[in-house]
Amino acid sequence: MGGMPILKLYNTLTREKADFRPIDPQNVRMYVCGPTVYDYAHIGNARPIIVFDVLFRLLRHVYGADHVTYARNITDVDDKINARALRDYPGLPLNEAIRHVTEKTETQFLEDATVLGCLDPTVQPRATENIAGMIEIIEKLIAKGHAYEAEGEVLFDTRSMDDYGQLSKRNLDEQQAGARVAVEAHKKNPGDFVLWKLSAEHEPGWDSPWGRGRPGWHIECSAMSGRYLGDVFDIHGGGIDLIFPHHENEIAQSRCAHGTEVMANVWMHNGFLQVEGRKMSKSEGNFITIYELLHTEKFGGRKWPGEVLRLAMLMTHYREPIDFSIKRLEEAEHLLSKWPVYGDAAGEADPAVVTALADDLNTVAAIQALHALAQKASADSRHLGTFAASAALLGVVPKEVELDEAVVHEIDGRVRERLELLKAKNYAEADGIRADLLARGIQLKDGKDPETGERVTTWEVKRSQV
């Protein structure tokens, strides 16, 4: 880590930005809440995928790729999944229908993440593969007096924990139950939440000391993070909407089960996303999935490349709300068009880019530094390696464009036309053709044929779209 800047991260737990000190620099551990695979991920889901991928890249850069463990879960047991399975596959047994829904949705999510330029996390555990760990935690909570059985459910007793609410800073006396926690008469306290619930005969379920049932929402992440990262780990991330109740309840379960002061030392949350100034919702008609943005013409009448969506997300600091718009995508695409395609160029990342990212993932400043570097690299290819390493930290890779034969033929014709104009000393029109092609991302390079001495012109694509 010699010469590396100290990472400073904003911690929702303390409401402060502070130096990041990993528990073990040889094994830096991060957990991020992944998707519930009942429907394709929407563009709001894309933000944490991208944000924490940048953090993963930065941690690997600072501590070494072999010294960072990133776990992002797949929630594949949930009432929303059951409902979608019944709706989409009414003729199939429920378990088979659920498998169709979860496999299809998980596959699409992983494809989306790849197109958005995200590295694979170190581990991507599924909830259904960790039921035994959930049961073990619940047994510990009951034994320690933090959970109780009531009417076929096991619930966490929020009053049993002296400092419940440490993340959201909510007073338990004033607190209402979260949106996904039903307030019912059998609860000791309104904020008590389900750890385990019985399953009807047709519903998915697993044998447990409390009968055949399935886990509550929050216990899943406690079990998976604990299994792969330990009782206490370095960073827990997710969207700001997860602070309460999900992350608050994760903390309560894990701390009470393991007897620790914290679950994770640093809690990071990305801000909300709205679309064209309005909350994104199906009722507003502005609900857009990542798949639709990348593969259909639903937004702005065209398809958008993954690297454009990624850069558009990173043009706002991760903790700030983001207004997602066609204009924002166009701005990102325009910026990318001015960056060189670097191929297999190798080098060291620019300290200005690293320093910006080390300051609580300041991607805005990092992009500014990267753009300045892109201008240098475009003028002098000796800077391409530095640009390549710096762009890789952001995960933004300007793509070489594959042009169809008709476009290549048209560009070649324009180049020949310009050569004829230059021979005729009609420089104004020749310059006009150069400017037109440059506006489309086609850069011309004039030279001489070494054998004949005649003027020749070559061209190359310098942008992500022509």
UniProtKB/Swiss-Prot annotation:
Compartment list: Cytoplasm
Entry cofactors: Zn(2+)
InterPro entries: Cys-tRNA-ligase, Cys-tRNA/MSH_ligase, Rossmann-like_a/b/a_fold, tRNA-synt_1_cat_dom, tRNAsynth_Ia_anticodon-bd
Cysteine-cysteine disulfides: none
Location of the motif 'KMSKS' region: 279-283
Keyword Ligase attached: yes
Positions contributing to ATP binding: K282
Domain of life: Bacteria
Gene Ontology molecular functions: ATP binding; cysteine-tRNA ligase activity; zinc ion binding
SUPFAM superfamilies on file: Anticodon-binding domain of a subclass of class I aminoacyl-tRNA synthetases (SSF47323), Nucleotidylyl transferase (SSF52374)
Cofactor note: Binds 1 zinc ion per subunit.
Keyword Magnesium attached: no
Motif 'HIGH' region positions after renumbering to this chain: 35-45
Binding site for Zn(2+): C33, C221, H246, E250
GO terms classed as biological process: cysteinyl-tRNA aminoacylation
Pfam families, A to Z: tRNA-synt_1e
Name of the top EC class for this enzyme: ligase
Gene Ontology CC terms, in alphabetical order: cytosol
PANTHER family: CYSTEINE--TRNA LIGASE, CYTOPLASMIC, CYSTEINYL-TRNA SYNTHETASE
HAMAP family: Cys_tRNA_synth (MF_00041)
Subunit record text: Monomer.
Protein family per UniProt: Belongs to the class-I aminoacyl-tRNA synthetase family.
Name under which the protein is recorded: Cysteine--tRNA ligase
